[in-house]
Structures are given as C-alpha cells and as structure tokens.
C-alpha cells in the first residue's frame, strides 16, 4: 500500500525577475506554463519551485536570523513533508491543481542570488524542489496538497511452452523480479510487478503487450524467445509494436558478453518504446538474465526520465 501525505501550503510567492527573492501574495494562478506574473514560468521543466518550512527552520538556526517566506525564491512554501525526500515524477495534487516533480535541488547561483549575497549560503540548491504543471488552477495559503509518490508499474512476461505447462519453475522470471526490486529500492521508488507466464504464442504475447500499453505500464520485460528456433517469436512480435527502437542497449550487451562467449552474439534481443511504455526482451536462461539485467539497470531511470522530458543531466 502506497502512503500519501497531506501537506499544507503556508505561503505562495512570486517575483518579476530571476535571481531575486519572491514576495508573498494572497493567491497565485497556475497555468500550463507555471505561475502567472512569475519570472520562472515558461515551457520548461522548472516551471515552479517548492520549499518546506522544515528547511527554513534549519537554515534560520544556521544563519541566526529569521527567513521570510519567498526569500529563498520558492514559489510555494509548504509544511508537513521534507520535500527534498521527494523524487522526480512524484506528484502534488488537490481539486484545483496537479504538479509533477521534475528536479530535486539546483545549481547554486552564488553572488547572483540575493540570499547568498547576504548570508553566504542557501538552502534551495539542496532542499528545494521543482515541478511542472499537469493541471491548471489557483492556489493560496491554507490550501492542502496531497503528496503522491511515483509508483513504477512493470509488466513481466515469461514465454515458455514447458514452464507454462508446469514442467519446471520460471527461475529466470523470478530473477528478473529480484533485480527490479533491488534496483528500485536503492532509489526509494516503490514498484508493482504484474507477472504473466505464457506459452511461446504470438497472439498471447501480442495481447499482453497491447494490454500493457493500454494500461500505461512504465516498463515491460519479456523473458525467453529471443533466439532463432521455430518457437522463438518474441522479437518478431515486439519489433512490430515498438515506435522507437533503442539498439545501443542490446548491442552493447551482445558485444560485451560475446567476447568471452560467442553464443551470446546469437541473441536477437531488442529494446524500445511502445507509446509510453519501455520494453526490453531478454533471453530465457538465468545466466543471460543476470548478464542483461546487469547492463539494463544502468540506464533505466535515465531512460524513463528522458521519455518524460525530464532533464536529468
């Protein structure tokens, strides 16, 4: 069960110029480009900024003075959650607006920042967060936002005639599950894995893939059927459904492991994007599963950020 948190908006703040403090106002109007009459609004991934009073309190003690809301140039000052613990793609919503987190912290502007010039330090580069607008509306002090953590939904499909008939356990599929839990746990992203074990059947696989795309799964992993045998149909089915192929991932895996084991070069595995879903096709052996997942996890988050137009460089 994913826990949501209600946080309070304690101040809303705007400025007409970048690099200056923002001043509290009675309310703000949020459009698809950010806050009306605020210098940071625009068609980019940092349309507006948020900072929690929890950060204010810590910095006030270090600076030995009170810090006014908006002085860190945040648009929305909140209470009830350490905002820097949020992650890209988390959301803040209520009946009026919906915001999606795009960045945690930012580069410090040094002497061009008003607060830095005064006290020689700033909390925004480490503890401020940035968001884009998913739903336009108004916001004012006293409003409540619900924090909804991003949950990655993953479809795992193992294709095996014999395993689907119960002749042996799906060890490779179980190993992929372990890899996924270990990977996302380190980034503190919750995941839901929906698992299917089917025969090497093109129609069944196509149905599973179409359902995953229709239900907007973040990732699909297939296991098995990447060779050239008469029942190896996975790549043929997937290749017809992807909109954009990502050849470098699987090419690199084949070359790396094929150097010591030439049989690894025979895999036809592919990776790509089906609308809003990233898909990887893996071979069916446990050994190959470990090899492929070792390389795949190195770029998974960066890939999903790219697909959601989040600049994670």
Where do the model's predicted regions map?
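Electropositive, beta-rich accessory/interaction domains or terminal extensions
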Residues: 1-106
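Short, basic/aromatic beta-hairpin or loop at an interaction surface
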Residues: 65-75, 113-128
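Short alpha-helix capping/helix-loop boundary micro-motifs
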Residues: 77-80, 84-85, 128-137, 141
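Mid-chain, well-packed structural core segment of small domains
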Residues: 81-114, 244-265, 269
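Loop/turn positions that initiate beta-strands
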Residues: 89, 96, 136-144
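Glycine-rich phosphate/diphosphate-binding loop of Rossmann-like nucleotide-binding domains
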Residues: 151-200
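N-terminal small/polar loop signature for handling phosphorylated ligands or for N-terminal nucleophile
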Residues: 183, 189-223, 227-241
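Proline/glycine-rich low-complexity loops and linkers
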Residues: 234-313
